[in-house]
Design a protein with these regions (language model features):
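Conserved ATP-binding/catalytic segment of the ANL
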Residues: 406-474, 491
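Conserved C-terminal "lid"/linker of ANL adenylate-forming enzymes
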Residues: 472, 497-500, 546-604
Length: 604
């Protein structure tokens, strides 16, 4: 395996088969069954991909047809994705949290002729949509669906399809697939990924093979040159239907010949990390915030010595983040390497090379926290329309947590007159599926208009200010970044989530979700019964949250200060539609629900 390999691959399936030939009987995809991790080897995976690809062609599917894929993260997700592409088809990854309405939009918009779904539970809303979508013809259940045949849909069993093609031998299937993929080029569409819709109905982003290969090439160069390329282990737990995990958690590991473990779920993530001991992790900022809060609470309970060491580690980390490396810090740095930091690293398995944050902006203080604990943090930047990774921090360029690093290999970046970040390169999508008007707005003269505002620092690293569409412009014409203020609010132990508003208004106001664990402790100390709705009506509780807001205001400029706030009825979540699957808040949905309450703050 060499870095030069990535430029020669014509498609993602060719890259996979090359790695499968090199890795042979080495473990590739691992998941837990009956309490034990079980692996599929590279050779076994390649055979199954070929058999399923031929089974899909056997259903009458033709080159370029779309196949929707609805499943939790598991080995079959990867196998299905590769098989769809090996059949000359196009994958349409779909979130397992989608409603019937969401599924219907994607099925009708993509024109998917076939659907692969993992189990009966996920099939319920999906099949209700499929029966209304005239394009859908075939449904394949990875697990038995126990579904009666319908007049418009034909149901198939995953294992049954594999067994049917295995009768002719895996060799015959391999030969057919090899011949077919020889005609698939880097410019051909690999998948249509629907954006999570922070601002409206999801649009289908057409990602071609070259876009993802360009991303894999750039990321592999960073990892190989800055950290060394060895026997890498990835733990996959972000949704594979999101471009970030699809590229960073699936195709990057494939390109590096790595082993992929599939987490059992967020509730078991901590124990899975300790068991799997990953070398690389791809994470979204919200999870880093949660992990930071948990570590701080646990250290707080361990007494004065642990708290003292934590304080010194953070102080040294903050100085180093500002470029101040003091000789006086070396003895304490040495002590921390022998005491606190190894314990923290063990929480992450003990052999992690780097943790990559992406999908949303990372609060610099969170990044500095993990760096202070001896864990290397790399913040990436991108969007589905760009493969999705545009840039990433790396040691060779100097890691600075208020930047998202320099553009990756093969990526051109320039800043427009209004501050918008523009991107050009093979990583840029070919457009939005069946949406030429939106495509023309997004891509002009070959440059992708990202909708993000930022600049390049003296070392060529990208600094993101905010989303162009999210930027608050107050009644005096001043620009305010809501993400900066929200990020500072949610670092307070009293506050779990926040959204600030203030467009065309004299000042900012906030919608706040109190931290549940903190609220339990507060109620116990105040001898109050814990009921969040009741607590939010107590003046003393509100004053405690006010103190947290005021702490943040002390570090903000006049136009950034949050003057008034109100409480949300419940946490923002994927289930209530107020967060995307990558855990970004959906501002338009939150405003729909709480708009009147927010507006009332200006009348108080």
């Amino acid at each position: 395996m060499q870095l030069s390999d990535f430029e020669k691959f014509q498609n993602l399936v060719a890259m996979f088969f090359e790695r499968a030939r090199e890795r042979g009987d080495a473990p590739f995809l691992s998941a837990k069954h009956d309490g034990a991790w079980r692996a599929i080897t590279w050779r076994e995976a390649a055979d199954r991909v070929c058999l399923m690809a031929e089974a899909l062609r056997g259903l009458g599917l033709k080159d370029g047809d779309r196949v929707a894929l609805v499943s939790e993260n598991r080995p079959e997700w990867c196998l299905a994705d590769l098989a769809i592409m090996a059949a000359g088809l196009v994958t349409v990854p779909t979130y397992i949290t989608n409603t019937e309405r969401d599924h219907l939009h994607i099925l009708e918009n993509s024109g998917a002729r076939a659907i692969i779904v993992s189990n009966a539970k996920l099939a319920r809303p999906l099949l209700a949509a499929a029966l209304r979508a005239p394009c859908a013809e075939h449904v394949i259940g990875i697990e038995p669906l126990r579904q009666a045949q319908s007049g418009t849909l034909t149901f198939h069993d995953w294992d049954g399809l594999l067994a049917g093609k295995a009768k002719n031998g895996a060799g015959a299937a391999r030969a057919a697939v090899e011949a077919r993929i020889a005609g698939i080029g880097r410019a051909d569409t690999a998948c249509i990924i629907y954006t999570s819709g922070t601002g409206g109905a999801p649009r289908g982003v057409m990602q071609h093979h070259g876009a993802i290969l360009c991303n894999v090439d750039g990321a592999a160069h960073i990892l190989a040159n800055d950290f060394g390329w060895d026997e890498e282990v990835f733990l996959s737990f972000l949704p594979l239907s999101h471009a970030y995990e699809h590229t960073g958690g699936q195709y990057l590991p494939i390109g590096m010949g790595a082993q992929i473990f599939y987490a059992e779920g967020l509730e078991k993530l901590a124990s899975n990390i300790e068991e799997v001991r990953p070398t690389l992790m791809v994470v979204v900022p919200r999870l880093f915030e949660v992990l930071r809060a948990r570590i701080m609470k646990q250290v707080e309970k361990q007494g004065r010595v642990a708290n003292y060491l934590m304080g010194r580690a953070l102080a040294i980390g903050e100085r180093q983040a500002r470029g101040r490396h003091r000789l006086l810090d070396r003895p304490m740095d040495f002590l921390l390497e022998k005491s606190l930091r190894p314990k923290i690293r063990l929480r992450f398995g003990g052999r992690i090379k780097a943790m990559v944050s992406g999908g949303a902006p990372l609060n610099p203080d969170v990044g500095v926290f993990f760096e202070s604990m001896g864990l290397t943090m790399l913040q990436g930047y991108g969007q589905t329309e760009a493969g999705p990774v545009i840039s990433c921090n790396r040691p060779a360029a100097g890691i600075k947590m208020d930047t998202v690093g320099p553009p990756m290999k093969g990526v051109e970046v320039r800043i427009a007159e209004d501050g918008e970040i523009l991107v050009r390169g093979e990583l840029v999508m070919h457009g939005y599926w069946h949406n030429p008007a939106e495509t023309a707005r997004a891509i002009q003269d070959g440059w992708l208009h990202t909708g993000d505002i930022g600049h390049l620092d003296a070392n060529g690293r990208i600094v993101i200010t905010d989303r162009k569409k999210d930027m608050i412009v107050n009644d005096k014409g001043d620009n305010v970044s809501p993400q900066k203020v929200e990020g500072m609010l949610t670092l307070q132990p009293e506050i779990a989530q926040a959204m600030v508003s203030g467009d065309k208004r004299p000042y900012l106001v906030g919608l706040i979700v109190p931290d549940a664990e903190w609220a339990v402790e507060w109620a116990r100390e105040q001898d109050e019964k814990f009921d969040l709705a009741t607590l939010q009506g107590l003046p003393a509780f509100r004053n405690a949250i006010r103190e947290a807001v005021d702490r943040v205001n002390g570090d903000l400029s006049v136009i950034e200060k949050v003057r008034q706030f109100t409480f949300a009825d419940e946490a923002f979540s994927i289930e209530n539609g107020e967060m995307t699957p990558s855990l970004k808040i959906r501002r338009h949905k939150i405003r729909e629900r709480y708009g009147a309450r927010i507006d009332a703050l200006y009348k108080a």
